[in-house]
Amino acid sequence: MKSSFRFANVCGTVYQQGNIQFAGDGDMLYSPVGNRLSVFDLVRNTSFTLPFETRKPIARVAVSPANTSLVLVADEDGHAILINVSRRALLAHMNFKLPVRDAQFSPNGQYLAVTHGAQVQVWRTPSVLVREFAPFVLHRTYVGHFDDVLSITWSRTGRFFLTTSKDMSGRLFSLDPVPGFRPKTFSGHRDSVVRAFFSLVEYTIYTVSRDAACLGGQ
């Protein structure tokens, strides 16, 4: 007698840590459950857990805006896997060698920005259509902070991105060199800056610190 059992879901395990991510129009939710990733369909009221696992509990989840089936999950030590959720396929392994505090795909999905201690690394994302020998290729490393980087926020065009750090500052970087542009620092906080945001027209930048202070700059 032959049987064809396959992994479908995790029962009895609860959320421990890591960020949750909405995908598409908000009808899908990705949530870390230990060292696995669960997917919730909020419209059909169903869920399943992917049959892939990281070495340690998941600390960060990133979803590509250009293809919401493309998801990166990184564990506490910086070991990451890239998954195609719709096909339930494991695309690549990556060791970032340091804990990943934030990871964000660019708006077009072609780049992945990852915190790396006091630096930010931007990687070219692999194609989901072809199998590549080196799926992740380092584009550039960005420096300027003096302590761990905590968050990354891309501009709508993907030409610039914001970072925040424990050094109580935020910085604006360009993805590629722009004539006449130098990375700009946003200071004035008295505690770690946990997040930064672009205004609607991206003329103003807001930084928020752990002590609930919000500052704006242009």
Where are these regions (language model features)?
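N-terminal cofactor/phosphate-binding cores enriched in small/glycine residues
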Residues: 32-49, 55-60, 78
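Loop/turn segments within WD40 beta-propeller blades
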Residues: 20-26, 62-68, 103-109, 146, ...
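WD40/WD-repeat beta-propeller blade N-cap
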Residues: 11-15, 52-58, 94-100, 142-149, ...
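Conserved strand-to-loop turn within each blade of WD40 beta-propeller repeats
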Residues: 33, 74-77, 115-118, 164-168, ...
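Per-blade loop-tip surfaces of WD-repeat and WD-like beta-propellers in eukaryotic adaptors/scaffolds
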Residues: 2-4, 39-48, 82-92, 117-139, ...
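Core solenoid repeat modules with strong leucine/isoleucine-rich periodicity
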Residues: 107, 116, 124, 144, ...
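Intrinsically disordered, low-complexity acidic/Ser/Thr/Pro-rich linker and tail segments
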Residues: 1-43, 121
